[in-house]
Amino acid sequence: MLKLYYKFNFATEPKLTYPNNHTNHSNHDNSNFNNEALKFQLLEELPQSIQNYLSNFEVTEIEIIKTVLLKAKTSFNNTIDSYYLLEDMEIEILHVLKRFKAILIQKNETVEAMQGYLMKSLKSEFAEMHTLNKRRDHLPITSLFNQ
């Protein structure tokens, strides 16, 4: 319902005015659209579940997390004789990111301040996954039906 207001000017007749409740939503909408476009561009080559989770972070946080993630993967792959893709470690990465977010909340820290912690956590998780894969590769193949 539109409310009308009267402004009285004693020198002349009353003037009919409309309240100016209009806020400029176009700038806000445009900013959100730009952020979503930047997020899409940053996340597009990551596995889908990681994209979905990281899309909840701010653009600057995503830039830091993605950089740390790719450095951790490269560093880890350089130290072993195998090569893992992000898709090979998708579940492990997602678990690390969820724990990382919980630590950020508990310690009331920024992504930038905790990027060293994220790097160590990712490399540790990758090493554990690699160790489990190597153990699995060396286990004898047995079947419950052959006993």
PLM-predicted stretches and their roles:
Residues 1-71:
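Charged low-complexity intrinsically disordered patches
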Residues 84-147:
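Short, cationic/aromatic linear interface patches
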